[in-house]
């Protein structure tokens, strides 16, 4: 079910990892950001949009992880965009076939994969999504995944953060696609911090919507976690351990794996990250 969170902006929340699809209303139709996740959920989204007389005129994937590269036939054949690096990474990862990706990533059977990753890369350094609607700024960085983009809709006071600034997920660093995953993540947080004063509503890729009072709080929380990870300290983070939200205890395993990978990189290269 669609829920309005700002003037001309709605979200659709999936039961899979509390994933958020963002719908932005434009002049002739809507921009769809990270639609997902199960087939029945995307069919419901398509039905809700159709019932309200809305046509999808553009799509955008914030980064090249499978749950952000989805689409459903009921959403139509609008152009689907991502940053140039995001699109190139998606093509490369899908070059061995969708079935191989599904097996490696453990994608649930309820997820339709026939339209997975069919996105067009925007020219490098494109500043805004090309569509007839509110101006959507692209804030590209290299935290979490190659070509990751946050989206800022200034006239709505809205920041779509992709897989950052979540109240349920810790920062997950890209340990394989970058020379310095720690600094890349910290640089991305600084980028988001630079626009925080313009944000009244924060939409993470997974988790709860945040208000203006939570934007800097979540930035600080993510930064503190990354610092603790870098220094191999135990993070005082409510997303881990007994304070984690019910059903999210598996995030502790993600943290343990990141500690291990970062320690291996430090041993190999001599520097954290």
Language-model regions: role of each:
Residues 12-13, 119-120, 140-142:
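Short Gly/Pro-enriched turn/cap motifs at secondary-structure boundaries
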Residues 28, 53-56, 77, 155, ...:
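A general structural motif
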């Amino acid at each position: 079910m669609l829920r309005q969170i700002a003037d001309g902006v709605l979200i659709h929340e999936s039961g899979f990892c509390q994933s958020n699809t963002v719908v932005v209303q434009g002049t002739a139709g809507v921009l769809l950001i990270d639609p997902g996740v199960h087939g029945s959920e995307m069919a419901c989204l398509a039905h809700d949009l159709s019932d309200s007389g809305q046509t999808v005129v553009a799509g955008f994937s914030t980064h090249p992880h499978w749950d952000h590269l989805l689409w459903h036939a009921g959403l139509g054949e609008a152009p689907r965009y991502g940053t140039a690096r995001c699109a190139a990474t998606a093509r490369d990862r899908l070059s061995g076939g969708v079935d191989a990706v599904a097996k490696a990533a453990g994608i649930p059977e309820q997820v339709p994969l026939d339209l997975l990753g069919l996105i067009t890369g925007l020219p490098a350094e494109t500043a805004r999504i090309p569509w007839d609607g509110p101006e959507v700024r692209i804030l590209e960085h290299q935290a979490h995944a190659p070509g990751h983009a946050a989206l800022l809709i200034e006239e709505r006071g809205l920041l779509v953060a992709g897989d950052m600034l979540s109240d349920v997920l810790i920062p997950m660093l890209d340990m394989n696609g970058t020379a310095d995953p720690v600094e890349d993540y910290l640089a991305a947080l600084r980028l988001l911090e630079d626009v925080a004063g313009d944000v009244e509503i924060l939409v993470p890729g997974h988790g709860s919507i945040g208000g203006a009072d939570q934007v800097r709080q979540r930035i600080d929380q993510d930064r503190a976690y990354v610092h603790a990870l870098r220094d191999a300290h135990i993070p005082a983070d409510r997303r881990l351990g007994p304070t984690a939200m019910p059903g999210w205890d598996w995030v502790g395993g993600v943290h343990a794996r990141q500690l291990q990978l970062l320690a291996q990189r430090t041993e190999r290269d001599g520097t954290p990250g």
